[in-house]
């Protein structure tokens, strides 16, 4: 854990801790690899880590280690879904995460993540798990 001013940082590396090939929106979109979708990322990885954060903790999410690219459906469902399904407001989510990368090409994906979160409407949809 890294200590920054006022916050303890917990790390999550998408390429190492989730998948080097994340894709798709819903588990039902990918019957052969439902564990690599945005829905799986949000429900099985991101949401539990966010819920486990203390008041003085943030989640540092590394997006470029071992991952070549991201589709918009994965990013939207994986990140903005936290807001859309009412788990956190966009302000709460943005205050709890920091998107990190070392490859400057991934600045584009960071901007897309922040854009999707900003556009998400809080609790605009009820989450119903998709079937594979």
Please provide the spans of the model-predicted regions.
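Short amphipathic
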Residues: 9-17
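Extended, charge-rich low-complexity interaction segments
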Residues: 122-132
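Amphipathic alpha-helical interaction surfaces in cytosolic regulatory modules
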Residues: 17-43, 49-59, 63-110
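Short, Lys/Arg-enriched N-terminal segments with co-localized hydrophobic residues
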Residues: 1-8
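Short glycine-/polar-rich loops that comprise or flank the Walker A/P-loop
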Residues: 8-10, 94-95
């Amino acid at each position: 854990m890294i200590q920054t001013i006022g916050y303890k940082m917990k790390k999550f590396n998408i390429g190492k801790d989730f998948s080097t090939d994340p894709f798709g929106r819903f588990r039902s979109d990918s019957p052969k690899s439902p564990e690599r979708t945005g829905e799986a990322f949000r429900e099985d990885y991101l949401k539990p880590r966010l819920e486990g954060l203390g008041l003085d903790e943030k989640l540092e999410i590394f997006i470029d280690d071992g991952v070549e690219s991201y589709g918009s459906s994965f990013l939207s469902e994986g990140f903005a879904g936290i807001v859309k399904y009412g788990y956190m407001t966009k302000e709460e989510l943005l205050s709890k995460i920091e998107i990190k990368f070392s490859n400057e090409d991934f600045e584009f994906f960071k901007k897309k993540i922040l854009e999707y979160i900003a556009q998400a409407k809080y609790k605009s949809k009820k989450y119903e798990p998709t079937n594979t």
